[in-house]
């Protein structure tokens, strides 16, 4: 409970709010990248507390929102095949394609099942050798390792009826697209702590330098987010544009190396 209590402490949060409001000499516009951060910000009313000194714009960090229509239509075409057992996380079932969604395919007789892990999909492939089991692999960098592990495990076990519809996206191109937009107002980012725990933050450094925006790797609890905002506002006030790490308890600059040895990061 230490980390839960420490990063949800109301007194610490109030102190950080005062610090942010005292530091800001003008209105600053920040974007949190991750949907988990957005959830905390909205649930705790942090955006309302900090307005008008800091405006928070909610970012693209939801796999459901960034999965392309083309990929959804591919998933629907596969799920409708009688020889396919199609598996997906539950939040993808009602995402519409050009004509319908996975829930409707299931209602029409398609074998569409909700799983909680790609390894669950692999287990279904083992149990149903007469079906081609497809896992809809959506998400950012954080979901890629588990999906890769399932494919590796399938190869180890010699499971030939398991496949993955890969729909991964990465965060940096999304940030660049936002910054390149003619109507962009974002002046700094809170980067997703869990993504950076896997990838590190080196790929954000050129973005910060090129676009002159502070990028703060940030966790998900209220105190995490307020600390991240405080660091970003301080950089903006001082005219600095760097990558800083608020989420020091989980993230290292180089992320997790291929051998998984975090001591080297």
Across the structure, where does each feature detected by a protein language model lie?
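Secondary-structure boundary elements
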Residues: 127-131, 153-160, 181-184, 213, ...
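Short, surface-exposed amphipathic charged segments that create phosphate/polyanion-binding patches used
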Residues: 71-74, 126-133, 177-182, 204-206, ...
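Phosphate/pyrophosphate-binding betaalpha-module
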Residues: 136, 140-203
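Metallocofactor- and cofactor-centric catalytic cores in central/energy metabolism, strongly enriched
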Residues: 1-130, 144, 148-157, 165, ...
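Conserved small/polar residues in nucleotide/adenosyl-binding loops
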Residues: 264-265
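Short catalytic-loop micro-motif centered on adjacent basic/acidic residues
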Residues: 30-32, 113, 134-137, 163-165, ...
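A conserved active-site cap/scaffold subdomain adjacent to cofactor or substrate pockets
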Residues: 165, 183-252
């Amino acid at each position: 409970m230490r980390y839960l209590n420490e990063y949800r402490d109301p007194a610490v949060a109030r102190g950080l709010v005062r610090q942010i409001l005292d530091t800001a000499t003008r209105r600053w516009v920040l974007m949190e990248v991750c949907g988990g951060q957005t959830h905390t910000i909205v649930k705790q009313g942090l955006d309302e507390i900090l307005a008008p000194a800091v405006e928070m714009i909610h970012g693209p960090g939801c796999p459901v929102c960034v999965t392309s229509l083309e990929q959804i239509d591919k998933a629907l075409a596969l799920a409708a095949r009688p020889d396919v057992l199609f598996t997906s996380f539950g939040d993808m079932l009602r995402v519409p394609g050009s004509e319908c969604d996975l829930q409707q395919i299931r209602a029409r007789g398609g074998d569409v099942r909700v799983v909680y892990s790609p390894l669950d999909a692999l287990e279904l492939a083992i149990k149903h050798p007469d079906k081609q089991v497809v896992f809809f692999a959506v998400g950012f960098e954080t979901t890629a390792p588990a999906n890769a592990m399932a494919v590796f495990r399938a190869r180890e076990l010699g499971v030939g009826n398991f496949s993955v519809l890969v729909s991964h996206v990465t965060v940096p191109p999304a940030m660049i697209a936002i910054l390149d937009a003619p109507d962009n107002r974002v002046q700094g980012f809170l980067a997703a702590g869990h993504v950076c725990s896997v990838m590190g933050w080196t790929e954000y450094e050129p973005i910060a330098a090129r676009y002159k925006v502070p990028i703060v790797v940030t966790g998900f609890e209220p105190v995490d987010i307020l600390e991240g905002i405080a660091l970003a506002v301080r950089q903006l006030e001082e005219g600095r544009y760097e990558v800083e790490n608020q989420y020091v308890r989980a993230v290292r600059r180089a992320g997790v190396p291929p051998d998984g040895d975090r001591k080297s990061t």
